[in-house]
């Protein structure tokens, strides 16, 4: 079964997101834990959360993915920005325990000309401070496009972060197809080679989720602009190869394409039709 969903608005609550997912034939979804450009998070409505959990169980949902706000930058040169990142991480991971055994994804951050090594050290220290042995949430580092001073533009940087984390069993990777293509990993012409490189450097056992996006910009552009499936440089054929790849097909896929709910439903319909049943592979 193809486990696929899209990014959904949390403005109407948790159960409403589950209902929206079901309405477009999705069996998972992604959401922001708080305003993506701000710091405030809504109070948890436990009845609403319980409603979502029940709906997920009844409809056999895959794990869902919470996304940290874009303002989170644990490797900033500014101490207050790093402190804010810590506060958000602590709060978000505590809130995620009301939605146990799911994923929490964040952008590693921008080192802002301090250098990659300094930035990675800050990220490692932050995660070592916030991760707990008894947490049920797996924290995912997102692959980045290499825009500006982003950390996570190559597999080696993500590996270095993971290697520095004491509770590394609580951490994994979310691969963004647009980001890796823009970063210079040719998933169109050499998908097998990219997967082998990921496995060699990080290990496929650390790959937990995929952001499924086409790219508005050409290969190795370091731009990070998502396109609708089939309307970018990766193309529909390239995306279909990804969801059917034997090393990836079991993972949950999350669309972040510039679409409304109906548009995401159309993409999901197309991808479900293109997904080959394992029994005929």
From Swiss-Prot:
Keyword DNA repair attributed: yes
Superkingdom as given in the UniProt entry: Bacteria
InterPro entries membership: AP_endonuc_2 (IPR001719), AP_endonuc_F2_Zn_BS (IPR018246), Xyl_isomerase-like_sf (IPR036237), Xyl_isomerase-like_TIM-brl (IPR013022)
Cofactor: Zn(2+)
Co-factor binding details: Binds 3 Zn(2+) ions.
Reactions listed under catalytic activity: Endonucleolytic cleavage to 5'-phosphooligonucleotide end-products
UniProt-annotated binding residues for Zn(2+) 1: 67, 107, 142
EC number(s) stated in the UniProt entry for this protein: 3.1.21.2
Entry keywords, A to Z: DNA damage, DNA repair, Endonuclease, Hydrolase, Metal-binding, Nuclease, Zinc
Pfam families named among the record's database cross-references: AP_endonuc_2
GO molecular function, one term: deoxyribonuclease IV (phage-T4-induced) activity
Positions contributing to Zn(2+) 2 binding: 142, 176, 211, 256
GO biological process: base-excision repair
Binding of Zn(2+) 3, residues: 179, 224, 226
Function per UniProt: Endonuclease IV plays a role in DNA repair. It cleaves phosphodiester bonds at apurinic or apyrimidinic (AP) sites, generating a 3'-hydroxyl group and a 5'-terminal sugar phosphate.
Family: Belongs to the AP endonuclease 2 family.
Protein name (database record): Probable endonuclease 4
Species of origin: Alkaliphilus oremlandii (strain OhILAs)
Source organism phylogeny: Bacteria, Bacillati, Bacillota, Clostridia, Peptostreptococcales
Encoding gene (name): nfo
């Amino acid at each position: 079964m193809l486990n696929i969903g899209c990014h959904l608005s949390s403005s109407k609550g948790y159960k409403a997101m589950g209902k929206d997912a079901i309405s477009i034939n999705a069996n998972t979804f992604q959401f922001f834990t708080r305003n993506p450009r701000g710091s405030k998070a809504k109070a948890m409505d436990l009845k609403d959360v319980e409603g979502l959990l029940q709906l997920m169980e009844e409809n056999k949902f895959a794990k869902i993915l919470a996304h940290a706000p874009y303002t989170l930058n644990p490797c900033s040169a500014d101490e207050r920005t790093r402190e804010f990142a810590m506060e958000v991480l602590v709060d978000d991971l505590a809130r995620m325990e009301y939605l146990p055994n799911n994923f929490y994804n964040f952008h590693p951050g921008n080192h802002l000309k301090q250098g990659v090594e300094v930035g990675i050290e800050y990220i490692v220290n932050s995660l070592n401070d916030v991760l707990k042995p008894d947490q049920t949430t797996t924290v995912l580092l997102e692959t980045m496009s290499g825009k500006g001073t982003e950390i996570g533009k190559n597999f080696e940087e993500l590996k270095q972060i993971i290697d520095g984390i004491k509770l590394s069993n609580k951490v994994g990777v979310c691969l963004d197809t647009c980001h890796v293509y823009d970063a210079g990993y040719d998933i169109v012409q050499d998908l097998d080679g990219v997967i082998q490189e990921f496995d060699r450097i990080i290990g496929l056992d650390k790959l937990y989720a995929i952001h499924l996006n086409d790219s508005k910009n050409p290969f190795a552009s370091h731009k990070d602009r998502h396109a609708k499936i089939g309307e970018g440089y990766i193309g529909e054929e390239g995306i279909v190869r990804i969801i059917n790849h034997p090393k990836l097909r079991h993972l949950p896929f999350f669309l972040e394409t510039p679409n409304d709910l109906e548009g995401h439903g159309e993409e999901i319909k197309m991808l479900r039709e293109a997904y080959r049943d394992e029994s005929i592979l």
